[in-house]
Amino acid sequence: MEYAGKDAQLWAAIGREEQRQEGTIELIASENIVSKEVAAAQGSVLTNKYAEGYPGKRYYGGCQFIDQVEQLAIDHAKELFGAAYANVQPHSGSQANMAVYQALLKPGDTILGMGMDAGGHLTHGSKVNFSGKLYHTYGYELSPETEELDYDAILAQAKEIQPQLIVAGASAYSQIIDWDKFRQIADEVGAYLMVDMAHIAGLVATGYHPNPVPVADVVTTTTHKTLRGPRGGMILSKSEELGKKLNSAVFPGTQGGPLEHVIAGKAQAFYEDLQPAFKDYIGQVVKNAAAMAEVFNESETIRVVTGGTANHLLVLDLTKTGLTGKDAQALLDSVMITTNKEAIPNDQRSPFVTSGLRVGTPAITSRGFKEDDAKQVASLIIKALDNADDQTILAEVKEAVHALTQAHPVD
């Protein structure tokens, strides 16, 4: 598209990024490809409008149509997850989490969340994050034997530290999470239960993972990842009464004017998520991840953490390859496969290096990849990592990647 007075360097960079996305197999589990309708809504004239407040209660005039847009997003979100309350204004998942902490806690209170090397997120209590600076935070780990959540150990830890808030949910955990067991743990120690379902929200919406909304006090999520919406955040609850505190924590507590053009993109994405085709899509995401796990499990050098996956992602232990996660990520980048380095349970390397990779199937599934394609991608990863110094083989992998991306263009 041509624009008068455009910044040529900017648009050249955007064009190169478009080419990169077209020519790359995208396996970062938190990335996806939005529809043209979502992109159009986000690029609409709503970006011009300031709208501090909430529908029907704004601090600016001229918000009558903005109110309609935001209310649609709220209504679609509530229907999608069976929630009594939804706030679609958080700019990100991190800001959604921050707002919940502000609503439920006071500085110095104690949070028990998933440890980073167990698959948790920065905002679940990392000492370099606001969550670890404003609150006393502790991380629960995985069972050394199964590499899955050990609910008895989490209960024992909760009894010991007596947290005011327990955070369930992960950014790199491949198995089903038992929300009811977390509810029992929280009730036993008198804590609030917050679920961060950012990664699995699309699976929850379609029944491929149990729904935490009826169980938890508060649920947060991003709106991209498996929901295929714009980058943003959202807060859900079964309690309208608690929703009043949450609204105040978002605005004016942690944010000013909402990004209504992004909220329009959220509304469009949620509308798409309510259609039958979205359930088919998520089903294929899960099948593709399982197909990749099957291939990786046959490798002599790559180990799948937990032995498999029940959702959209896998964590790969690269110890036997002799490569760090950082090295493997760079190597795969060179053959046009995009992944991210990831800590494995009890990883001794720093988060900037790691001993593993995280791979996910949302983006390739949006491009129409099926199980056989996913298996081929896994085989190409193994081939590349097992032959890291062989430029001839790496060139073969890159050529095969090119063929796959040509066969499955970004719509």
UniProtKB/Swiss-Prot annotation:
Name the record gives this protein: Serine hydroxymethyltransferase
Keyword Ribonucleoprotein set for record: no
GO BP annotation list: glycine biosynthetic process from serine; tetrahydrofolate interconversion
Biological or metabolic pathway of the protein: One-carbon metabolism; tetrahydrofolate interconversion; Amino-acid biosynthesis; glycine biosynthesis; glycine from L-serine: step 1/1
Necessary cofactors: pyridoxal 5'-phosphate
Sites annotated Plays an important role in substrate specificity: H224
Catalytic reaction list: (6R)-5,10-methylene-5,6,7,8-tetrahydrofolate + glycine + H2O = (6S)-5,6,7,8-tetrahydrofolate + L-serine
GO molecular function: glycine hydroxymethyltransferase activity; pyridoxal phosphate binding
Primary location: cytoplasm
